[in-house]
Amino acid sequence: MKTLLLTLVVVTIVCLDLGYTRTCFITPDVKSKPCPPGQEVCYTKTWCDGFCGIRGKRVDLGCAATCPTPKKTGIDIICCSTDDCNTFPLRPRGRLSSIKDHP
């Protein structure tokens, strides 16, 4: 009887995966951190501001309970649901200009 009870406890712990928390990259640190309870979705939100042409899109990384919906046009949100799946997006390399480009 004790063996059966112990087996049931072990199976329950394995099946429930007690204490698991999703980890996502979080800005501004861009470090992997555990998400708060109930937030199992990682997101990457990008948008342009007044300096987009100079420094590229702004980026916000974080956790959410569900995939956020953009509140304005021009905001892109990508969601995923595995640990640390919301890496910082790569920016295309800009071309350095020279004095010859500006007569």
From Swiss-Prot:
What's a Gene Ontology MF term here?
A: ion channel regulator activity
Any GO CC annotation of this UniProt entry: extracellular region
What this chain does, per the entry, is described as:
Binds with high affinity to muscular (alpha-1/CHRNA1) and neuronal (alpha-7/CHRNA7) nicotinic acetylcholine receptor (nAChR) and inhibits acetylcholine from binding to the receptor, thereby impairing neuromuscular and neuronal transmission.
Record has Disulfide bond as a keyword: yes
Q: Which SUPFAM superfamilies match?
A: Snake toxin-like
Q: What is this protein called?
A: Pseudonajatoxin b homolog
Keywords tagged on the record: Acetylcholine receptor inhibiting toxin, Disulfide bond, Ion channel impairing toxin, Neurotoxin, Postsynaptic neurotoxin, Secreted, Signal, Toxin
Q: Which domain of life is it from?
A: Eukaryota
Tissue expr: Expressed by the venom gland.
InterPro entries named among the record's database cross-references: Snake_3FTx (IPR003571), Snake_toxin-like_sf (IPR045860), Snake_toxin_con_site (IPR018354), Toxin_cobra-type (IPR054131)
Disulfide-linked positions = C24-C42, C35-C63, C48-C52, C67-C79, C80-C85
Q: What is its main location?
A: secreted
Concerning its family, UniProt says:
Belongs to the three-finger toxin family. Long-chain subfamily. Type II alpha-neurotoxin sub-subfamily.
In its UniProt entry, the species of origin is given as Pseudonaja textilis
Q: Does the keyword Secreted apply?
A: yes
In terms of Pfam families, this protein maps to: Toxin_cobra-type
Q: Name the CDD domains on file.
A: TFP_snake_toxin
Tell me the leader sequence span.
Answer: 1-21
Return the Gene3D superfamilies for the record.
Answer: CD59
Subcellular location(s) per record: Secreted
